[in-house]
């Protein structure tokens, strides 16, 4: 891929063709990937967090798998594998495919939270503060 990816205006929710270097049961090869890093990180880091998509619709009842219909701009009906986040260089990004609508991003966020269950360690009284910080990290910088 091209190093010009470091200058792209990447946003959480964007789907790109991505080269995954998986081994074993990990996703590998070129496939769609969902940018799942906050926008401040996307702007300043040479790396980003991506969730792989697959068109092999298996284990559809798993709470960490989110169905995405092809009508959002994909070639095939797909699933986001929320339990498989990958940190990778922006150089592994290929062409832009589409941006996931917010209704699906909400489902992906829940799937990702459930994949680690880390939310169980947060005091419920702090959840609003965490949510506000997340909103700030996704604000579009001008």
Language model regions located:
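C-terminal terminal-subdomain/extension
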Residues: 2-8, 72-142
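Short, charged beta-turn/beta-strand-edge "cap" motif at the junction between a beta-strand
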Residues: 21-24
């Amino acid at each position: 891929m091209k190093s010009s990816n470091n200058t792209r205006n990447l946003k959480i929710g964007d789907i790109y063709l991505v080269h995954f270097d998986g081994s074993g049961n990990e996703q590998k090869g070129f496939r769609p990937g969902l940018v799942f890093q906050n926008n401040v990180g996307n702007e300043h880091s040479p790396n980003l967090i991506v969730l792989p998509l697959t068109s092999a619709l298996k284990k559809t009842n798993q709470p960490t798998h989110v169905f995405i219909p092809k009508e959002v701009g994909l070639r095939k009906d797909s699933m986001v594998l929320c339990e498989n986040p990958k940190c990778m260089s922006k150089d592994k990004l290929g062409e832009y495919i589409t941006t996931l609508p917010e209704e699906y991003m909400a489902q992906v966020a829940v799937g990702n939270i459930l994949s680690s269950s880390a939310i169980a360690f947060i005091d419920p009284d702090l959840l609003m503060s965490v949510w506000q910080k997340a909103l700030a990290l996704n604000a579009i910088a001008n």
